[in-house]
């Protein structure tokens, strides 16, 4: 992954999104770009898999991730907490840590932003039961978030061609 990050930086990337403490640590050693960090892990009984527990948050903060991303959908975490409750707990423990919520719909994005997420991403749109079947970038969704959500918006997922990113 460090070589991929170097290639991305040389091509003009302004940030890197990476999974696992190992990859994040190695990437931060070779590029001077902000890193959005996640830890993907499956948990029985929940569809949540992107930075699901405080243990993963602690690991990401310890490795110096610039922005910590968590799943911000309507499913409950293994401990029964909502995405908004989890974000509030992260901000209480790490008030200076930037947090991104990987969301699927407007309601979840707003709840995460109101709970303290600094960024909301469209990452999970099309990947939850509520949004299943959305296979292309949803510009109306991105526009609604950009105009109504208090957090900064990162359009992510289902962007297949450079023309879609403009």
Question: Model-flagged regions — what are they?
Answer:
Residues 2, 49-55, 81-87, 134-143:
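Charged helix-capping and loop-helix junction motifs
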Residues 12, 31-35, 63-67, 93-96, ...:
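Glycine-enriched alpha-helix->loop->beta-strand junction motifs that scaffold or abut catalytic
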Residues 21, 40-42, 72-75, 104-105, ...:
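Short, ordered loop/turn segments at secondary-structure junctions
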Residues 31-45, 86, 91-104, 146-157:
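Short beta-strand/loop segments at the ligand-binding rim of alpha/beta enzyme cores
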Residues 32-81:
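Glycine/small-residue-rich loop that forms an oxyanion/phosphate-binding "nest" at active or ligand-binding sites
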Residues 45-60, 104-118, 151, 155-166:
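Catalytic cores of alpha/beta
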